[in-house]
């Protein structure tokens, strides 16, 4: 049994257009959600003092993993390491653990922020005045 009798003038091209129009808002929403999640990333910037050696990334991973601190990635960058943590709440605990484990380094906590999209700025720019 065919459903052609429900939509007699619906061609495959029109069906494709409808599907694309339905998919675009879904894609936009998922992208905005992923941007929001990436704003919550916390980073630690580990830089050795002058003359000290850069710690091994695996050693840093082991020290943090022992304390149950979830790590997204450890990336070498010039003369330093960038440690991305799974949650900002773990940033302080990770910094304390690494200060005890690595006495010859400077550890700076950074909150990764991405700029707010233009369309989102425009939506939140004007506040409605009630009353």
Swiss-Prot record:
Domain of life: Bacteria
Family indicated by similarity: Belongs to the MzrA family.
Descriptive protein name: Modulator protein MzrA
Keyword Cell membrane among record annotations: yes
Location (main, coarse): membrane
Membrane topology of this protein: Single-pass membrane protein
Annotated source species: Pectobacterium carotovorum subsp. carotovorum (strain PC1)
Transmembrane stretches, start-end: 15-31
Regions of this protein lying in the Cytoplasmic compartment: 1-14
């Amino acid at each position: 049994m065919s459903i052609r009798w429900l939509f007699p003038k619906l061609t495959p091209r029109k069906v494709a257009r409808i599907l694309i129009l339905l998919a675009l808002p879904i894609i936009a929403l998922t992208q905005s959600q992923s941007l929001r999640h990436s704003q919550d990333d916390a980073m630690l910037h580990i830089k050795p003092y002058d003359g000290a050696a850069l710690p091994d990334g695996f050693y840093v991973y082991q020290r943090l993993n022992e304390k149950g601190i979830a790590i997204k990635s450890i990336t070498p960058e010039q003369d330093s390491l960038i440690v991305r943590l799974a949650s900002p709440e773990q940033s302080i605990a990770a910094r304390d653990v690494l200060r005890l484990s690595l006495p010859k380094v400077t550890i700076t906590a950074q909150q990764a922020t991405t700029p707010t999209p233009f369309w989102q700025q425009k939506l939140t720019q004007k506040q409605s005045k009630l009353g």
